[in-house]
UniProtKB/Swiss-Prot annotation:
Its cofactor is Mg(2+). Keywords: Aminoacyl-tRNA synthetase, ATP-binding, Cytoplasm, Ligase, Magnesium, Metal-binding, Nucleotide-binding, Protein biosynthesis. The gene is pheS. The keyword Nucleotide-binding applies. It catalyses: tRNA(Phe) + L-phenylalanine + ATP = L-phenylalanyl-tRNA(Phe) + AMP + diphosphate + H(+). This is Phenylalanine--tRNA ligase alpha subunit. Belongs to the class-II aminoacyl-tRNA synthetase family. Phe-tRNA synthetase alpha subunit type 1 subfamily.
Length: 336
């Protein structure tokens, strides 16, 4: 390639770039315009740059000037296109025949909705909200709650330890002891919070999930009070016509221990069935003593429930993983 051919190719490329940009509608997005321009010029610019080095030394000065002028000309054409767009943007064009766009509505997560509703019910029953740390000591998480030293829940395969004596709490029950240490009875608290287990993520288990803990401690508190309060909660949450039942269960920090079942419809066409929604019982005297209170004077009851599982029973969900998938198609159903 000689100098005259080089200059002719540079002029031709400049003309084609100007023609391309001049022919684009101002409604064309700038990134689209740049994409079309790059497709036209990039390979040819690279070829001209390579050819520059092959020209005789006496021609390179003129060819180099032409190459720089070419790049400036292309940039000027692109700037002119942008200015045309800016000038046109001041004119608002509305197509009244276009369908309206839907409005995205934010919503609370179904588990949060359940926690808020349960919390409001217990507030109306005289409970206040209490919180505790998610990183706990082994004593608050196990020892103060009457877990024997060789209890399997304390093993590494069940609990996530942060250090020799610190761990991610496996339940919200430590809030019981911390609350009783801080406040004198009568105490009625509801403790929502995140808990952690070394569980596999499957249809019914999650390694991190929310839990709700309830505690009532005073003089003369009995199992009758526990049953009456939880039955009233179920009536308000599930409806006055739903039946509840209590059965025996075991937890180290209560004695006696029980579980409460409620008749619910899981939405699978099989009608009402009994579903366990919480564990409960009378606070073990050792727990009351660990909090620094006299177990001969004070008694109490406690319960714990998983709002995710309650949300599943409320909304007919059979796989807990759906609650954690962040699928907008699922979550937008709960927008109010």
């Amino acid at each position: 390639m000689n100098l005259s051919e080089y200059l002719a190719q540079a002029d031709a490329l400049a003309a084609e770039c100007h023609a391309l940009l001049a022919g684009l509608d101002v409604a064309t997005r700038l990134d689209v315009a740049k994409g079309q321009l790059n497709a036209l010029k990039d390979d040819r610019l690279n070829a001209l740059q390579s050819a520059l080095r092959m020209l005789p030394a006496e021609d390179r000065r003129a060819a180099g000037g032409a190459f720089n002028t070419l790049k400036q000309s292309i940039q000027a054409a692109l700037d002119a296109f942008g200015q045309r767009q800016s000038a046109a943007s001041g004119v608002v064009q509305v197509d009244a025949t276009m369908p309206a766009r839907g409005i995205w509505r934010g919503s609370l997560h179904p588990v949060t909705l359940v926690i808020d509703e349960i919390s409001e019910i217990f507030r109306e029953l005289g409970f206040t909200i209490a919180l505790g740390p998610e990183a706990e000591t082994e004593w608050y998480n196990f020892g103060a709650l009457n877990f024997p030293p060789d209890h399997p829940a304390m093993e590494l395969h069940d609990t996530l330890y942060l250090g020799e004596d610190t761990l991610l709490r496996t339940h919200t029950s430590p809030v019981q002891v911390r609350t009783l240490q801080r406040y004198a009875p009568p105490v009625r608290v509801l403790a929502p919070g995140q808990v952690y287990r070394r569980d596999f993520f499957d249809a019914t288990h999650a390694p991190a999930f929310m839990q709700l803990e309830g505690l009532a401690v005073d003089e003369g508190v009995s199992f009758v009070d526990l049953k009456a309060t939880l039955a009233e909660f179920a009536r308000r949450f599930y409806g006055a016509t739903r039946r509840v039942r209590f059965g025996p269960s075991y937890f180290p920090f209560v004695e006696p221990g029980a579980q409460m079942d409620v008749e619910v419809d899981l939405g699978d066409g099989k009608g009402l069935r009994w579903v366990e929604i919480l564990g409960c019982g009378m606070v073990h005297p050792n727990v009351i003593e660990a909090a620094g209170l006299d177990s001969e004077k004070y008694t109490g009851w406690a319960f714990g429930m998983g709002p995710a599982r309650i949300a599943m029973s409320r909304y007919g969900i059979n796989d807990i993983r759906v609650l954690y998938d962040s699928d907008v198609r699922f979550l937008e159903q709960f927008a109010r």
